[in-house]
């Protein structure tokens, strides 16, 4: 069965990371999962490996509200750099339903979706299956 090689979760909520890991593992659609507790640690990893395609995720679930570097700051850094892997799909995964965040989401055409927490196993399954079809 075809699988997504690498998925990343960037979120400071340990419970969300844990539950997401369990759900993603249960789908059996992902080879490897890498987790980051904030945008700063994530962008440092991305920049360190920007020329190593196999080290960069195919799919990212990005929280907006995190300490140190939030999701929007991560996206600013991410879009300002060139990565060897051109197609890194990013979904916003947040509890924010604010108009400001929704409008800002629309200003990033490369963002694939805006998912409101808590997310169900079915939502994750649909995202992963859709990415496999497109990949």
Q: Over which residues does each language-model region extend?
A:
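Active-site residues of response regulator receiver
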Residues: 63
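Receiver (REC) domain active-site loop signature in two-component systems and cognate sites
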Residues: 66
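Helix N-cap/capping motif at the beta->alpha junctions
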Residues: 35-48, 71
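C-terminal output helix
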Residues: 119-128
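Alpha4 helix (beta4-alpha4-beta5 surface) of REC/receiver domains from two-component response regulators
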Residues: 73, 85-87, 96-113, 126
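Conserved acidic segment of CheY-like receiver
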Residues: 5-15, 20-24
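Short amphipathic alpha-helix used as the core "switch/output" element in two-component signaling
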Residues: 44, 72-84
């Amino acid at each position: 069965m075809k699988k997504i090689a690498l998925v990343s979760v960037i979120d400071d909520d340990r419970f969300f990371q844990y539950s997401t890991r369990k759900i993603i593992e249960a789908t059996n659609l992902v080879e490897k999962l890498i987790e980051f507790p904030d945008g700063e640690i994530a962008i440092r990893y991305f920049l360190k490996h920007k020329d190593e395609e196999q080290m960069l995720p195919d799919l990212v679930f990005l929280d907006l509200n995190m300490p140190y570097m939030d999701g929007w700051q991560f996206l600013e850094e991410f879009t300002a750099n060139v990565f060897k892997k051109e197609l890194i799909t990013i979904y916003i995964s947040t509890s924010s339903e604010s108009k400001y965040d929704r409008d800002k989401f629309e200003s990033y055409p490369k963002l694939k979706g805006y998912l409101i927490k808590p997310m169900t196993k079915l939502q994750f399954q649909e995202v992963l299956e859709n990415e496999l079809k497109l990949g």
